[in-house]
C-alpha cells in the first residue's frame, strides 16, 4: 500500500458541492487533469506599506476566469472589503453594510493575473498594517459569480455555472441599498425557507421573499420578490 504524501497534489476537489463542502469520493484522487484546492482558492496574509499602488501577489489568477478577493484588517478594527470580477476596478462592497457597491480607488484597486492591487485605505492598505486576504477563483463545482437584473416578479430564476447544487449562496444588491441575504444548506436541510443576514446580528429567519420556494439545482436558483 502506497502512503499518501501530503506535500504532493494527490487530493483533488472530488464532487465538492460549492461552499457547502462534502467531498464524495477518493476513487480518482491523484489523477492528472483534476482541480485542486490551491488552484482555485488561496488564503494569503500580507503586510501593507501605505503605497497607493501596492501589488499583492497571491499566485492565483482571478482576472482571467473571474473570481472574488475578500480582505480583512488583522491589526485594527476595520471592514471586510470585497471586490470581484463583475463589479470591476476601484469598486467594492463591505459585509457589514447594506449599501450598494462603492467606488474608491484607495481600497482594492484591481484584480490582476497574479493577485490584486490595493490603495492606502486603512481597510486594505494602511502602512505597516497586517491583513488577511481570501481569494476565490470561479471554477465548476467550487465557486461562481452571477450578476442579474431583477424583474420584480414573485419568483425569478437565475442561471449559474457551478455544475452542481450549491451548498451556499449570498445575495447583495449593487445598484441600491439592501441587506446581504445568505442561504446555506446546513441551516435547514432540504429547504430554502431559512437564511441569515450577513450584515446583521439576528438569528435565522424565513426567506420565502428572498429565495422563493424552489430549491436550487445544478444549473439555477430562484429569488423572490424582495431580491429581484
Predicted regions and their residues:
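Surface-exposed molecular-recognition determinants
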Residues: 2-228
Amino acid at each position: 500500500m502506497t502512503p499518501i504524501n501530503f506535500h504532493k497534489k494527490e487530493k483533488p476537489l472530488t464532487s465538492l458541492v460549492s461552499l457547502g463542502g462534502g467531498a464524495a469520493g477518493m476513487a480518482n484522487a491523484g489523477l492528472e487533469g483534476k482541480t485542486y484546492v490551491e488552484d482555485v482558492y488561496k488564503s494569503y496574509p500580507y503586510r501593507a506599506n501605505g503605497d497607493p499602488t501596492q501589488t499583492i501577489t497571491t499566485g492565483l489568477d482571478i482576472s482571467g476566469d473571474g473570481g472574488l478577493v475578500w480582505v480583512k484588517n488583522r491589526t485594527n478594527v476595520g471592514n471586510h472589503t470585497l471586490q470581484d470580477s463583475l463589479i470591476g476596478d476601484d469598486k467594492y462592497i463591505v459585509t457589514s453594510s447594506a449599501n450598494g457597491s462603492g467606488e474608491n480607488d484607495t481600497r482594492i484597486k484591481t484584480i490582476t493575473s497574479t493577485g490584486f492591487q490595493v490603495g492606502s485605505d486603512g481597510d486594505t492598505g494602511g502602512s505597516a498594517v497586517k491583513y488577511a486576504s481570501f481569494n476565490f477563483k470561479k471554477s465548476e463545482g467550487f465557486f461562481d459569480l452571477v450578476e442579474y437584473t431583477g424583474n420584480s416578479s414573485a419568483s425569478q430564476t437565475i442561471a449559474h455555472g457551478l455544475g452542481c447544487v450549491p451548498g451556499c449562496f449570498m445575495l447583495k444588491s449593487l445598484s441600491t441599498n439592501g441587506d446581504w441575504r445568505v442561504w446555506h444548506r446546513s441551516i435547514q436541510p432540504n429547504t430554502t425557507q431559512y437564511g441569515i443576514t450577513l450584515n446583521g446580528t439576528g438569528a435565522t429567519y424565513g426567506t420565502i421573499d428572498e429565495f422563493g420556494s424552489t430549491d436550487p439545482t445544478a444549473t439555477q436558483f430562484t429569488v423572490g420578490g424582495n431580491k429581484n
